[in-house]
Amino acid sequence: MKIFLSSHGHLASGLKSSLEILYGNCDHITVFDAYVDENSVQEQIELFFETVEEDQQILLISDLYGSSVNQAMSMYLDRPSTTLVAGANLAFLIGLMGRDSITREELKDLIEQSREMLCIVNLEEEEPSSQEDFF
């Protein structure tokens, strides 16, 4: 599985930096920080797809559903074995680590788990039950 992660500003490279601190080398993840220079999302996705092998599963991940970055990435959904996920967060990306592939059902479960990691933390409440299972 190859991953293309893009965001407005430096969020994408920051998320990859965090993953590399936790997991080491993440060569299977290509990042593009949009709107920080003259390069476009479309140009970078085209370069990314030049590195993709015919039988590889592709996961495109954007920071925000419906945004310009997400819309640009959606133009590539007609490519074989390509899926687009919006709303990148570190919990979601951690769940992808160590996987060679992921089914649609597993992807839905991982998205739900990563949503649960976004919560208000109160001292008197227990941590979400899925947190132990997640890590």
Where are the language model's segments positioned?
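N-terminal loops that bind phosphate or other acidic moieties
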Residues: 2-135
